[in-house]
């Protein structure tokens, strides 16, 4: 059974978790090691149009932010955005079995690369199962309020899985 103490995380889930929870402490409570590829670190610092989540990301000193760019395989580089490609490449390089990616194509390629995949909703559900005090409905609403895109299928699944169906 692969260890679920280590995870490599992409940009979108980092931003989604800050939107849902207000910080990244949930990751610290679930994982011994949370690695952030250099490429993801750069994407976060650029901050999109709003700069959302930069302060929370920088204050999470326990995150293992990689200090140098990766050499990414041409297959990953040509198939995915830089963040997703770097998450999968770092996982393969460091023999870490679990990655956190929200985008469908990145998730598919991670699985084809032999990796276990979770996403921002998967992390929230695991936290709830392990006793972290949170409402999945509230977390999802906060994500939607910050323009995090979630399909109705994912929302319905998460609420049902969390036992929060009405």
Give the predicted meaning of each segment.
Residues 2-97, 104-107, 111-115, 138, ...:
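Active-site-proximal, substrate-binding regions of enzyme catalytic domains
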């Amino acid at each position: 059974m692969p260890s679920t103490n280590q995870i490599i995380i992409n940009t979108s889930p980092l931003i989604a978790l800050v939107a849902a929870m207000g910080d990244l402490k949930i990751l610290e409570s679930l994982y011994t090691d949370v690695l952030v590829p250099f490429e993801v670190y750069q994407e976060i610092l650029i901050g999109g149009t709003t700069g959302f989540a930069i302060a929370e990301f920088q204050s999470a000193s326990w995150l293992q932010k990689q200090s140098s760019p990766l050499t990414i395989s041409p297959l990953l580089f040509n198939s995915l955005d830089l963040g997703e490609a770097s998450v999968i490449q770092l996982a393969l390089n460091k023999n870490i079995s679990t990655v956190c990616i929200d985008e469908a194509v990145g998730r598919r390629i991670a699985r084809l690369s032999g990796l276990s995949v979770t996403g921002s909703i998967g992390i929230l559900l695991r936290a709830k199962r392990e006793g972290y005090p949170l409402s999945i409905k509230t977390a999802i609403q906060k994500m939607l309020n910050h323009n995090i895109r979630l399909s109705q299928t994912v929302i319905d699944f998460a609420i049902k899985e969390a036992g929060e169906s009405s």
